[in-house]
């Protein structure tokens, strides 16, 4: 995959907002040392996260409402 686009990712995620939340959380996991599921020449965690979503390696879980998701992201970012 030469370039990853938002449209590639939206085939796997219900909307752009969910995509942003999911990619941000995954990028933070990669930053903390999680192993990437795709091989990439890029050291950018956001790009790696987007590639993982586009390839279907990272799943979307629709169990949190929007407010709970925002609180969880804020909590994760403050760690």
UniProtKB/Swiss-Prot annotation:
GO CC annotation: DNA-directed RNA polymerase complex
Record-level Gene Ontology MF annotations: DNA binding; DNA-directed RNA polymerase activity
Gene3D superfamilies: 3.90.940.10
Top-rank taxon: Bacteria
SMART domains on file: RNA_pol_Rpb6
Keyword annotations: DNA-directed RNA polymerase, Nucleotidyltransferase, Transcription, Transferase
Catalytic activity of the protein: RNA(n) + a ribonucleoside 5'-triphosphate = RNA(n+1) + diphosphate
InterPro entries in the record: DNA-dir_RNA_pol_omega, Pol_omega/Rpo6/RPB6, RPB6/omega-like_sf
Enzyme superclass (EC): transferase
BP GO terms, sorted: DNA-templated transcription
Documented EC number(s): 2.7.7.6
SUPFAM superfamilies hit by this protein: RPB6/omega subunit-like
Function: Promotes RNA polymerase assembly. Latches the N- and C-terminal regions of the beta' subunit thereby facilitating its interaction with the beta and alpha subunits.
Classification via PANTHER family: DNA-DIRECTED RNA POLYMERASE SUBUNIT OMEGA
Family: Belongs to the RNA polymerase subunit omega family.
Subunit structure: The RNAP catalytic core consists of 2 alpha, 1 beta, 1 beta' and 1 omega subunit. When a sigma factor is associated with the core the holoenzyme is formed, which can initiate transcription.
Descriptive protein name: DNA-directed RNA polymerase subunit omega
Native source organism of the sequence: Bdellovibrio bacteriovorus (strain ATCC 15356 / DSM 50701 / NCIMB 9529 / HD100)
């Amino acid at each position: 995959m030469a370039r990853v686009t938002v449209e590639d990712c939206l085939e796997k995620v219900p909307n752009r907002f969910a995509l942003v939340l999911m990619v941000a959380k995954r990028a933070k996991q990669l930053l903390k040392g999680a192993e990437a599921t795709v091989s990439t020449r890029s050291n950018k965690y956001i790009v790696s996260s987007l590639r993982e979503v586009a390839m279907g390696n990272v799943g979307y879980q629709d169990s949190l409402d929007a407010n709970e998701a925002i609180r969880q992201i804020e909590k994760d970012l403050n760690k």
